[in-house]
UniProtKB/Swiss-Prot annotation:
This is Alanine--tRNA ligase. It is an enzyme of class 6 (ligase). One of its GO terms (molecular function) is ATP binding. It comes from Leptospira interrogans serogroup Icterohaemorrhagiae serovar copenhageni (strain Fiocruz L1-130). It is found in: Cytoplasm. Catalyzes the attachment of alanine to tRNA(Ala) in a two-step reaction: alanine is first activated by ATP to form Ala-AMP and then transferred to the acceptor end of tRNA(Ala). Also edits incorrectly charged Ser-tRNA(Ala) and Gly-tRNA(Ala) via its editing domain.
Amino acid sequence: MKPKSVSEIREIFLNYFKDKSHNVVPSSSLLPAGDPTLLFTTAGMVQFKPLFTGAVELPYTRATSCQKCLRTTDLEVVGKTERHCTFFEMLGNFSFGNYFKEEAIEYALDCSVNHFGFDKNKIWVTVYTDDDEAEKIWLSKGIPKERITRLGKKDNFWGPAGDSGACGPCSELYLDRGIEKGGPNCATSGTCKPGCDCDRFLEFWNIVFNQFNQDTEGNLHPLKQTGIDTGSGLERVALLLQEVDSVYDTNELRKIISFYEELSGISYEDKTLSEISEKKNNNQQISSQVRNETKSIQDSRKTAFRVVTDHIRSVLFSIGDGIYPDRTGRGYVIRRLIRRATLFGRKLNFKEPFLYKLVDKVIEIYKARYPELQRNAAAITKTILVEEELFLKTLELGLEKIESLVQKTKAGGKTIFSGADAFLLYGTYGFPAEMTEEIVAEQGLDFDKKGFQEELEKDRQFSRESWKVNKVSLMTGLNVDKTEFLGYSSVSGKGNITHLFYNSPKSSNSLSQVDSKLQSSTPAGTGSYDSKQVSSLKEGQAGAIVLNKTPFYPEGGGQVGDIGFLRQGKNVFKVFDTQKENDSIIHFGEVLSGEFIVSQELEAEVEITRRERLKFHHSGTHLLNGALRTLLGDHVLQKGSIVSPEYLRFDFSHPSSLTSEEIRQIESWVNESIRKNFPVETKELSIEDAKKTGAVATFGEKYGERVRVVQMGDASIEFCGGTHVSRTGEIGYFFIKKESSPGAGNRRIEGVCGPAVIETFQNRFSELTESVQNLNLKIKSELGEEGTKILILSFIPGPDEIREKLEKEGASAVSFFRDLSENIATKIEENTSSFLKIKKNLAERDFENNTSVIENVLASSVDTGIGKIVSAIFEDKDPNSLKGLSDNLKVREKNLLVILGSRNSENASIVITCSSELTLKGIHCGNLIKTACELLGGKGGGRPDMAQGGGKEKQNLESAIAGVINEAKQILTGERV
């Protein structure tokens, strides 16, 4: 069999099905669009789920793709087996109501034998237990009955991907790799065939006959149209065609391993055994024990090479698709992969960050097929480096933790390291189970694999549940027709009441979701409530009204719900919030006057000013998203947003904080788009047509068959159901108030648009004015003439000047006011520092020259007959102040030894000086200071006539000074004190 490269195999497959009239569809992101039930894209069919179920109009009936996939279900064995990877490419061909079993089997066999070059006589197949039809087709294609195996649901019923979707029985192709690949009993038992746990038969092609749609409850329903979903692992096919032992020996993965060999200086094909041989006497045999130990080292290093090779691909492709390391969800999986690779890297002598160093080389292998990697290379490299550095800071803590857990286990007289402790290390410190097992084995402990697996399964279940759509109904049993939304073109309109709900004081029933909503959105009353459907609502009652038509926008897409009034004559209902449940728009509020009954026609009036501000901020959010993707790169993905009347908040994926210059560029880009006054155009399109426009979708959102697309010239095009301005010029201006981080791998921008920009600058300059006035007042009152030079005399605009300049100059005034406010704020900070410094200098000068202080210190003098010794302790005085006071004391008194100390909140300092006469009598201040500093737990030194020092043991300051006095007395008098 002629070996073929991975890229050649990929092209052979895609071209084969292209020639069979299949649409070649690019790989979708690893972040599953519109399917929150999946952490990652795990199969080629994920992007086609709506086509299989008939949820959308078919753009084609045949497709083929090579899909990026990520699965971590077998993470613990990755690197140890020949075929397991977390990241892999899945070749696939798909039929949506077009061909079925006959053609799918024909294509699989033809491509495998006549295009890949597999020996037909070595191909075995499996079919589902009762799938006689599939077996009959295989027989007709020349596969003998003895090479056809029937397997049950566990092996031959596939799907769905996620909690719901298309699924059905499947048929798999295996290649017989020879009896030598079998297990110890395979050669003699005669039962070895597909389904055996050995490595003899390797599955390389799976044909799923999609006949059912599984709902979220696990029930199967016949599909309106049958389909074909094929999966063929590219790495596995390469393993077989290149006739190597594992997927890690295929050309692309082996190349990545070679990068790590070069970086580590260790060979993947470990030479440890031969090295030991050379060290031995030529005639001396290597013992069995040495061989076993050496083999263990070889296997350990080989596993480490495979783990880092697999994980760098997974991490690199994930970050390239906007999945950043995080504390929860899919981001946590990526973080765990980085940490696992870092740990295994220690077996290859990597003690410092190393994964990031090879990002560019790995991208070089894949960039032709996946250009997004090259575009996001800088972000990928930086993110991985940051994560490695972060983990290395906690790694030593983890190793200390495992040591303490081992000691705790032994102290309790146990010989088994518990699964719960192992999972603690796994989840908190990122320690893989196998590494924990190795470490505890070195300490003579067994490892509780079962207990660990139980804890792991609990965690997996929690992870799965946390990603399911867990939507609690606002109105239990609410089943009404769709509310027609009028709000795109109007802020008022008429609608008839279809449902009324009243929240009465809570009975013994549990509090429903609507009660929580009503309590949070109405000011009336306190305590708990129960909600019930009623035929009328009366004055003073809080509740909810559902209309058949309304201009009120329900909270969604980050935009908060509208408020306003529902009226009919003297009947008035104040709306505090608007929400959506299924297709019904619900108005929450309180009856201010009159009575409301079902079927009544109401006049609905949205609060106009608030809606306008929402439009400014929602359109501004789209422009901000466009700016970020244009200036920072396509790796930027929306992670969350809030659109309120007061401000906008936008969370996005990005590995590092933004520089001041980047913030200015983003702000200028948005303001330039506002100035260009682009028309804001909206279209309702099929999901497929919408994707063709290049519109940006919010990953994780689930879209219906038809979506609304909002375009703003060439600045932005997004899927969006919110309310917007007609032209970007209406926004007026945009200003970034704050940039921060909501979590690892993500950044957050808070900004304002339109009138909110005016108000923001008015408030900001008002605060600056107050700060300047307060500082100037302090400077004048506390420094007098000394402070004249640091008075702030900057021009600060008033509210009217700010409004006039912004309204006259528009977006260009934003930069002016940003720079001015930052300059004034900097000036305040600098001059406050100068004020405190001058104030301190004046205080020190006053202290040094204070007659009362000098007199008090001199009054405490000790006369030795040869000279006097004075000492004192102060609070919060620096050494310079103490030196200044010492000099003034020596002016007042001859033959004087001065010992002064000071304490602050952290440490103590001490200064020793003496008159020149005393140095002739044997006093050496530099020696005396060492006596003091020993007690203070610090250091010091100096000349015979002056020395200084200090230490952290401030409580010993009195003892330190007393020790110096005693030593000085002994020197001067010759008497031991």
